[in-house]
Amino acid sequence: VGTGAHYGDDLFAEVARYAMAAARRVAGKKYDLVHAHDWMTFPAGVEIAQRAGAPLLVHVHSLEYDRAGHGADRDIVAIEHQGLEYATRVIAVSYYTRGLINRVHSTPLDKISVVHNGVYARETVQAYTEQRTSSGPVVLFLGRVTFQKGPEYFVQAAARVLEHIPDAVFIMAGSGDMLPRMQALVEDLGITESFRFPGWLRGAEIERAFSTADVYVMPSVSEPFGIAPLEAMSYDRPVIVSKQSGVSEVLRNALKVDFWDVDKMASQIVAILELPELRRTIIERAREEIRHIHWDAAAEKLVPVYESVLRG
């Protein structure tokens, strides 16, 4: 959660430098297939594939369009396009992303395979409930506080929820360029006392956030997949997810909402918090569902894609 990496003073120079360094590192070696993940490795993937005479498979976890919408960086979009054009096969993390790749880059749909992400099984759950600092129900947003993640819609929905459940507490955990605006919006709406902004969480802090929340909300504007809802479900937490997300394709036991429909989002939050039977049913069914959404299943789906590329 948040942005902690530093890629150098010139990101594009770093991407080009990495491509050349990677190509030198593997010079003279033979490969059957090259698999590159997202735009920062696409130039390296293309360079290595050309030198090795091997097919290139590019894996799209997100597009620049997801992160920036119509304000997308043209240079990043150009690098994405180069990788997608050169690749023998493209893998998208969802049908949502598959469609977006087709619309933004005109990549043929029959060139794009879909392999959904998964989540690691959790053997134990640390108990943090005794550490709750609020007597009211807790609603969690955990992610980058950026345009893509829809934080403004979470705040707007929170204001509506508080009209029905005044003691509810909303946690916006994460950092990003929209954080100051969200803090100002919370103040303008007069709901400062009901909001917490703990910043960028790590490790046990993330576990504590999931464990002490009563519901997790992912209101993303454009989410290629979205692993956080699966993580929340692994903590037996009911989740509400944007329909504009890949994870909504694989989840049956989650409430779904268009990111812009803050009235419905608020109604769903209220329903989960005020209807114990609904909450219990969602948790019990999701507990079984999450067992089948794991990384081993994703890996198994990759095998026939590899085989297809290698057969030519």
Q: What is the predicted role of each segment?
A:
Residues 221:
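Aromatic "clamp/platform" in nucleotide-sugar-dependent glycosyltransferases that forms part
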Residues 234, 238-241:
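Short hydrophobic beta-strand element within catalytic cores of glycosyltransferases
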Residues 254-263, 271-276:
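Conserved acidic donor-binding segment of nucleotide-sugar-dependent glycosyltransferases
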Residues 1-28:
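A conserved catalytic-core segment of Leloir-type glycosyltransferases
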